[in-house]
């Protein structure tokens, strides 16, 4: 009888554990929900690992130990209850049951799936209609060091999207531009060059100067916006967080944050060789090696080459307008000398050389865009180095993390700024940037009702920009022609007056005077004009922050955060406009110079308090939750170096006639410099974000649904517009106020025993100006114009993304599995100007891929824009020619290729 009772007790415990396994997505949630930190930030792998063949291998020993430790923490915690301890024990039981299920899957079904980053665990079905499909959050499987966060993303009061290596490969996404189409309310258009890194989230974005979205790579903040548009390779995971993240990530994360994680050598072993070729001679090669010397040391080395011939051709030169070549290498060395201490050294170098800025004339009436036709083909070259040393120490009750980084960027850009075959003006820009950052964070790891994170951030950036602007005959010839006419008429008139004073009739005097001047060689003039300039703009930033998560009940958690951020921006400018007027007057040649030099400096300091308040309510044992958040966003102010050529050219035009008397240098007083400094400055942008959302785990964990609705109020919104009087170059202005509201929805699921995987997302953003008055030149006079009620430019109202793939496993032969997939994306409409006069209508793109796994080799066929949809990724207006004209860059046509990946 006693044995029967004991057996029944064991049976009941097993049934209870099975129920818990069905209800909860993973053991990590069971531990977290009862107040235990499942991921302490120092463990690189705490989730389920899937081998290359798709057979799941649970890291059971580590999970059991972690779950046991978690149980001990719960029991010993001052606020812990018996219920919490039981939940933690059940989590450990669940791990063991997962192991058993996975062994059965391997033994009985030979389950074949995807790689380690599939966000899922495969297990056998029972019965004809049984479906064991389950999806998991990627940060349960691809676990990286998180120095700041206390919870996984879908347990925080925020809206986010995560994609793993498998998803990146299926979408053939090699940078953020290609990835953004599958993230709701997020867009990074593909145009210009690698220098171009415009990103827009929820109506907030930036094309120049300070970014509105931040980027972290392996825990290191990328400082220079010109480095944002980088090539992905050996990426393990990408997280996109939407909404202000300033409380713990600081300024310039007003729209959101992108976190990129690369593969680490403790979790990945062996050598990867990737080769690819595609349409228009797209070519790619990658080689990576991961070596784990022991449980204490590991090393990875990786390198890549990527190139293409492009699809646009400059009709003026007859040469390609968007071909590119880039290459890079990465070193990562990780140490874990003790169970408490860790070190991670990263060095990442990338080189880019490409043609760029292939903008053709755009007709807003029918949306047609011509091939580019410029006399100066645009180009861009960049050398970029990102290095970081990350240190971690785990003590009793807390963790301490330090991230120190050094970043170098050196680039060289050439742009035809009139975008026509006539030589009006062109710009060269060379940047040299050095940056140092240091971030210290400490966070609690003990169980209880209060979890906290505190930290400090410090950065200093040296930036030197050499940006001369050259004006061609399209600008200088009208000036010299006007001066030539004035000089000629003046000489003829003076000579005729002397003849008339002697009694000669006026008509005869004028005719003889003209003949005399012409006989003596006449008057001819030409002008050369350029605006060289060197600008030094160092920036200093310091921030201190704290965030607390307080468990008000066993299901309700309050998040309270505050950051103080101080930013100082300096500018020291040494620039001048030089116009050389070459004249020949009646056989006498002379060169007169008109110059205007500006050599001065100024600075601005900005400080902000960035609060955040959130509530998260867990609704069931599977981890579903609803949340509400109020947070403040902030983008720092600064200076427009792009405006100097316009300012100086205006001064030259006003003083051009003085060259007739000799060389002339335009004087400047302190009052003049004060006006210049005020003209080039723009103010910080601030916003308040109000958000409601939900993270739901449905149908026994086979479907994840994320919902969010938000409302944002923006003050002093920063906009990139054409500079000043002549419309040369871009500058940043403050557009008064705007508001943005919208919804976001994302679904991700698995079916047919995890053979079918799918995801879909939708974002609607309605961003409009509520107070923005500018001036417009009408008949030579400036008149005020209001853009109130107009949509914010460059922001798509709708973003849609969907992808699905189906895997067919094989238990015999060299072929292990075949996978087919489709993806779909759409966005629009997008207005290109503040007046909403021209736009891109909503458009859709279709992609597909087919993959086959043959031993250690995977062969993939892929295609993009299979319907060959015609659309524009960017458009602008320019008045460089004297009249306003529109230019745009075409989106990529149908493309495709084949990839071969070998792992050994």
Task: Mark where each language-model region is.
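Solvent-exposed loop segments that connect transmembrane elements
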Residues: 313-319, 357-373, 418-425, 468-532, ...
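Transmembrane beta-barrel wall of Gram-negative outer-membrane proteins
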Residues: 270-272, 277-308, 312, 316-354, ...
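Membrane-embedded beta-barrel scaffold of Gram-negative outer-membrane proteins
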Residues: 390-415, 625-629, 642, 648-733, ...
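N-terminal periplasmic accessory domains that precede
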Residues: 176-179, 198-203, 216, 237-240, ...
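Short acidic/polar hinge/loop motifs at secondary-structure boundaries
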Residues: 218-244
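C-terminal beta-signal and adjacent terminal beta-strands/loops
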Residues: 463, 476, 634, 755, ...
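Gram-negative outer-membrane beta-barrel transporters
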Residues: 443, 453, 457-459, 554-558, ...
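N-terminal periplasmic "start-of-domain" segments of outer-membrane beta-barrel proteins
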Residues: 119-125, 131, 135-171, 196-198, ...
């Amino acid at each position: 009888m006693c044995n029967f009772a004991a057996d029944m007790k064991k049976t009941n415990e097993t049934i209870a554990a099975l129920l818990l396994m069905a209800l909860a997505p993973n053991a990590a949630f069971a531990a977290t929900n009862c107040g235990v930190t499942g991921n302490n930030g120092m463990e690189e792998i705490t989730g389920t690992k899937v081998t290359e063949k798709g057979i799941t291998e649970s890291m059971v020993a580590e999970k059991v130990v972690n779950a046991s430790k978690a149980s001990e923490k719960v029991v010993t915690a001052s606020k812990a209850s018996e219920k919490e301890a039981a939940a933690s024990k059940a989590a450990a039981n669940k791990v063991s049951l997962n192991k058993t299920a996975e062994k059965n899957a391997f033994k009985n079904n030979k389950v074949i799936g995807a790689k380690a980053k599939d966000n899922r665990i495969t297990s056998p079905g029972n019965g004809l209609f049984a479906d064991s499909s389950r999806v998991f959050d990627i940060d349960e499987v691809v676990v990286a060091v998180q120095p700041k966060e206390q919870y996984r993303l879908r347990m925080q009061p925020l809206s986010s999207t995560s994609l793993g290596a498998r998803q990146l490969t299926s979408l053939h996404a090699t940078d953020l531009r290609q990835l953004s189409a599958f993230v709701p309310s997020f867009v990074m258009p593909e145009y210009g060059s690698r220098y171009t890194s415009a990103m827009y989230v929820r109506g907030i974005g930036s094309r120049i100067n300070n970014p509105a979205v931040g980027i972290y790579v392996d825990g290191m903040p990328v400082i220079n916006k010109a480095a944002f548009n980088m090539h992905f390779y050996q990426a393990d995971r990408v997280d996109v967080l939407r909404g202000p993240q300033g409380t713990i990530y600081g300024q310039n994360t007003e729209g959101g944050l992108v976190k990129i994680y690369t593969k680490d050598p403790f979790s990945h072993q062996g050598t990867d060789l990737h080769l690819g070729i595609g349409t228009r001679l797209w070519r790619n090669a990658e080689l990576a090696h991961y070596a784990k010397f022991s449980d204490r040391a590991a090393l990875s080395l990786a390198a890549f080459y990527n190139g293409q011939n492009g699809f646009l051709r400059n009709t003026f030169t007859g040469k390609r307008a968007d071909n590119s070549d880039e290459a890079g290498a990465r070193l990562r060395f990780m140490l874990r000398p003790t169970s408490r201490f860790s070190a991670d050294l990263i060095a990442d170098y990338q080189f880019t050389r490409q043609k760029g800025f292939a903008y053709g004339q755009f007709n807003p009436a029918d949306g047609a865009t011509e091939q580019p036709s410029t006399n100066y083909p645009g180009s861009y070259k960049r050398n970029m180095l990102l290095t970081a040393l990350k240190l971690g120490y785990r003590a009793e009750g807390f963790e301490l993390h330090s991230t120190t980084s050094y970043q170098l960027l050196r680039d060289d850009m050439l742009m035809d700024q009139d975008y026509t075959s006539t030589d009006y003006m062109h710009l060269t820009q060379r940047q040299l940037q050095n940056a140092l950052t240091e971030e210290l964070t400490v966070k609690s790891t003990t169980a209880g009702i209060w979890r906290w994170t505190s930290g400090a951030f410090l950065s200093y950036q040296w930036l030197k920009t050499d940006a001369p602007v050259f004006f061609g005959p399209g600008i200088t010839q009208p000036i010299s022609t006007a001066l030539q006419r004035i000089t000629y008429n003046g000489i003829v008139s003076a000579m005729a007056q002397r003849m008339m004073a002697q009694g000669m009739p006026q008509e005869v005097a004028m005719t003889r005077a003209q003949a005399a001047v012409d006989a003596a060689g006449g008057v001819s003039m030409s002008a050369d004009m350029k605006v060289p300039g060197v600008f030094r703009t160092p920036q200093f930033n310091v921030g201190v922050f704290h965030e607390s998560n307080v468990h008000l009940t066993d299901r309700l958690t309050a998040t309270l955060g505050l950051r103080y951020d101080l930013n100082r921006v300096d500018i020291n400018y040494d620039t001048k406009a030089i116009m050389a007027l070459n004249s020949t007057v009646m056989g006498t040649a002379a060169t007169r110079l008109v110059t205007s030099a500006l050599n001065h400096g100024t600075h601005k300091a900005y400080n902000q308090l960035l609060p955040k308040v959130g509530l998260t309510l867990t609704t069931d044992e599977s981890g579903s939750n609803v949340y509400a958040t109020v947070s403040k966003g902030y983008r720092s102010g600064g200076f427009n170096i792009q405006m100097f050529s316009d300012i100086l050219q205006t001064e030259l035009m006003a003083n051009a006639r003085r060259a007739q008397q000799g060389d002339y240098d335009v004087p400047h007083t302190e009052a003049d410099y004060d006006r210049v400094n005020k003209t080039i400055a723009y103010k910080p942008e601030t916003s308040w974000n109000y958000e409601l959302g939900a993270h739901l785990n449905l149908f026994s964990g086979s479907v994840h649904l994320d919902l969010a609705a938000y409302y944002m109020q923006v003050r002093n919104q920063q906009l990139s517009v054409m500079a000043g009087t002549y419309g040369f170059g871009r500058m940043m202005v403050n557009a008064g106020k705007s508001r943005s509201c919208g919804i976001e929805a994302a679904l991700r699921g698995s079916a047919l025993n995890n053979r079918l995987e799918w995801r879909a997302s939708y974002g609607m953003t309605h961003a409009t100006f509520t107070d923005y008055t500018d001036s417009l030149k009408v008949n030579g006079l400036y008149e005020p114009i209001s853009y109130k009620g107009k949509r914010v430019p460059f922001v798509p109202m709708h973003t849609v993304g969907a992808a699905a793939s189906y895997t067919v496993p094989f238990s015999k032969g060299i072929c292990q599995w075949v996978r087919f997939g489709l993806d779909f994306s759409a966005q629009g409409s997008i207005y290109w100007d503040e007046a909403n006069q021209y736009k891109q209508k909503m458009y859709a793109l279709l992609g597909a891929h087919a993959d086959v796994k043959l031993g250690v080799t995977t062969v993939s066929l892929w295609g993009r824009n299979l319907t060959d949809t015609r659309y524009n990724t960017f458009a602008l207006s320019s008045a460089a020619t004297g009249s306003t004209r529109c230019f745009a860059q075409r989106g990529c046509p149908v493309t495709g290729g084949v990839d071969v990946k070998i792992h050994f």
